[in-house]
C-alpha cells in the first residue's frame, strides 16, 4: 500500500493525477494474457494439442519430436487425459516422467470406471512410466532428488519422452 501525503492546505480533491503510457497499447498484450481463462470444454480450444497442453520441447540440442510436455494422460480430473493419451501415442512416446502422481494414484486412475488412456496404461505396465509424486516447490530437496531420478530414468530408456504433471504448466513447464 501507499500513503499519500499532501502539502499543507491541499487535499485529495484538489490534486489531479495523470497516468500515461510510453506508447499507445504498450500493455495490451499483457492485459490480454491476464484475461485468459481455462475451461474444461474441448470446443473452447483450437486443437486437441492445445486442449491437452501437449507441446514439443525443442530447445538447445533437443531435436524436433524428441521431448514433449503435456497435461496428465492418466488423471482425467480435467477431462484431458484421453486427448493427451492419443497425442502421446501419435508422438511415439516411449518413456514418461509423471511429476504429479504416485504408482498407487496411477493404479487408481487405471482401475476407475470410464478410464480411457490405453496407450499410457500399456507404457505403465511395461515399466516405461516413472511416477515421482512431486510437489510444486522447485527448490525443495525432494523435488530436486525426484527430478534427478526422473532424468536418470530417461537416460536409461529410449525416447521420444513425455514429462507431465496434472495440467502440464507448472512442474512440467519448469522441467
Listing of model-derived features with the role each one plays in the protein:
Residues 20-162, 174-175:
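Cys-dependent protein tyrosine phosphatase-like superfamily
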Amino acid at each position: 500500500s501507499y500513503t499519500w501525503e499532501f502539502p499543507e492546505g491541499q487535499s485529495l480533491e484538489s490534486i489531479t493525477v495523470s497516468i500515461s503510457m510510453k506508447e499507445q497499447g504498450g500493455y495490451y498484450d499483457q492485459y490480454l494474457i491476464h484475461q485468459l481463462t481455462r475451461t474444461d470444454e474441448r470446443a473452447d480450444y483450437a486443437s486437441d494439442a492445445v486442449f491437452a497442453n501437449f507441446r514439443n520441447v525443442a530447445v538447445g540440442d533437443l531435436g524436433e519430436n524428441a521431448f514433449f510436455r503435456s497435461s496428465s494422460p492418466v488423471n482425467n480430473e480435467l477431462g484431458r487425459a484421453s486427448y493427451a493419451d492419443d497425442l502421446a501415442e501419435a508422438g511415439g512416446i516411449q518413456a514418461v516422467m509423471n511429476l504429479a502422481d504416485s504408482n498407487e494414484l496411477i493404479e487408481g486412475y487405471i482401475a476407475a470406471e470410464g478410464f480411457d488412456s490405453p496407450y499410457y496404461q500399456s507404457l505403465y505396465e511395461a515399466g516405461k512410466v516413472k511416477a515421482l509424486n512431486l510437489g510444486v516447490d522447485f527448490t525443495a530437496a525432494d523435488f530436486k532428488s525426484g527430478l534427478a531420478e526422473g532424468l536418470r530414468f530417461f537416460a536409461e530408456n529410449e525416447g521420444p519422452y513425455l514429462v507431465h504433471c496434472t495440467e502440464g504448466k507448472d512442474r512440467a513447464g519448469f522441467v
